[in-house]
């Protein structure tokens, strides 16, 4: 058993899109400084669940949520400060979504919005974030160039640097490599393994081999239910539930 502290605790979570019951009584404890992969077929609820962890679903008017999600023991749905939550819980999306500005300005954007104006402080944040995202050496001589001129894999690592610049404790990733080529995917995967020393990472992936490579724990979702959650090795070699076994062996999904 892991002796790491529980970072995210979810209890009896239900989510409805109008009358559609999209998540059903989800209970899960996500440990600090681990990579937790969410797997399952399309439409199973894994991305919907990911977006409950930083209240992204609040942006959809027909969504209703019941149950409790605690981050560091605090119920995030009883706290009105969503901006503080999204500072603590960063997000990286499926496709790189950089702003049409320089590499430097992309990474400095969040800190500037939060009132940091000192250039030396911003320079330090930008460099540290780009180093943490394993892309500093590739871009250090072109920080004033447009971020949109980078390759897809580089752009995604800039997106990760932009999330890191906000000094989060948790990073959510929604299929961050699905739009990337195999070499870029490998670089992002290597980066994720390094980042777990500093951050708690929750990643949605359709790629089961990726989940097996990069995660400590894996959660299998099906039809809005959390079917099984365990150490990744157990999920892939000795699953308890036949539905998990059927999915990972390719019998459906």
From Swiss-Prot:
Q: What's the family?
A: Belongs to the ABC transporter superfamily. Phosphate importer (TC 3.A.1.7) family.
Query: Which PANTHER family has this protein been placed in?
Result: ABC TRANSPORTER I FAMILY MEMBER 17
The GO biological-process annotations, alphabetized, read as: phosphate ion transmembrane transport
Q: What is this protein called?
A: Phosphate import ATP-binding protein PstB
Q: Which cysteines are joined by disulfide bonds?
A: none
Tell me what organism the protein belongs to: Clostridium perfringens (strain 13 / Type A)
Subcellular location, record wording: Cell membrane
What membrane topology is annotated for this entry?
A: Peripheral membrane protein
Is Protein transport a UniProt keyword of this protein?
no
Q: Does the keyword Transport apply?
A: yes
* Keyword annotations: ATP-binding, Cell membrane, Membrane, Nucleotide-binding, Phosphate transport, Translocase, Transport
GO terms, molecular function: ATP binding; ATP hydrolysis activity; ATPase-coupled phosphate ion transmembrane transporter activity
* EC numbers: 7.3.2.1
Under catalytic activity, the entry for this protein gives: phosphate(out) + ATP + H2O = ADP + 2 phosphate(in) + H(+)
User: What does the record note on quaternary structure?
Assistant: The complex is composed of two ATP-binding proteins (PstB), two transmembrane proteins (PstC and PstA) and a solute-binding protein (PstS).
GO CC, sorted alphabetically, is:
plasma membrane
Residues bound to ATP:
40-47
Entry-linked InterPro entries: AAA+_ATPase, ABC_transporter-like_ATP-bd, ABC_transporter-like_CS, P-loop_NTPase, PstB-like
List each copy of the ABC transporter domain by range.
8-248
Q: What is the lineage of its organism?
A: Bacteria, Bacillati, Bacillota, Clostridia, Eubacteriales
Predominant location: membrane
Provide the gene name from the record: pstB
Main function: Part of the ABC transporter complex PstSACB involved in phosphate import. Responsible for energy coupling to the transport system.
């Amino acid at each position: 058993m892991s002796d790491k502290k529980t970072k995210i605790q979810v209890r009896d979570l239900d989510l409805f899109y109008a009358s559609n019951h999209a998540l059903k009584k989800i209970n899960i404890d996500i440990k600090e400084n681990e990579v937790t992969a969410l797997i399952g077929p399309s439409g199973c609820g894994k991305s919907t669940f990911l977006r409950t962890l930083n209240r992204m679903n609040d942006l959809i008017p027909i969504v209703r949520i019941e149950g409790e999600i605690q981050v560091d023991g605090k119920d995030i749905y009883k706290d009105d400060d969503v901006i503080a939550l999204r500072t603590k819980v960063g997000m990286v999306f499926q496709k790189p979504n950089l702003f049409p500005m320089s590499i430097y300005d992309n990474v400095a954007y969040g800190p500037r919005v939060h009132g940091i104006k000192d250039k030396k402080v911003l320079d330090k944040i930008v460099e540290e974030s780009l180093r943490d995202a394993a892309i500093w050496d590739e871009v250090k001589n072109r920080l004033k160039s447009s971020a949109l001129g980078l390759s897809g894999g580089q752009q995604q690592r800039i997106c990760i640097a932009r999330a890191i610049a906000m000094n989060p404790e948790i990073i959510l990733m929604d299929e961050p490599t699905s739009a990337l080529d195999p070499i870029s995917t490998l670089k992002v995967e290597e980066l994720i393994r390094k980042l777990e020393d500093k951050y708690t990472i929750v990643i949605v992936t359709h790629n089961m081999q990726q989940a097996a490579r990069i995660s400590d724990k894996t959660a299998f979702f099906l039809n809005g239910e959390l079917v099984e959650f365990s150490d990744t090795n157990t999920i892939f070699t000795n699953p308890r539930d036949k539905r998990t076994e059927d999915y990972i062996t390719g019998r459906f999904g």
